[in-house]
């Protein structure tokens, strides 16, 4: 899985570097060109020592290719911050000091967008999540605060509205898998967010 995700990231970088290879004239609703976006919302962890959430957000940028009059494919990279979450008392009472989780990291992936009309669209996305986190191990009797770096994945979906030809807003759900089995730490996070996108 790790090798697959790394290969996807390198492939995404290569595609972003070569937008001129695709046609610029694929229809009225499908979007094509460079874009940047930002999300803000609520990141929730419900696993082992953690059952809570915090303010979270993300930024991203990429290039979108029109595949047909309604469909486009974006190749994008970004960075996500998924907040700090307090541990449940069952775990934290056995640890002295900090018991909060923290999760963030870079992303590289694909975004498939379908335009229902000139104004409304839906999209699905996914790719590699290069997680950098810390938190308690999943051990009720002797939890330890550890740090980890791992290559995992993310996936999500959203519904958006084109306010103007260049600006759009959307409601989104994304899932970020973040774990290190060797260290027995698992911070899978659900992100519920609103987003804005600007297209150049």
Features from the language model and the residues they span:
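Gram-negative outer-membrane beta-barrel domains
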Residues: 3-5, 20-200
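Bacterial N-terminal signal peptides
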Residues: 7-16
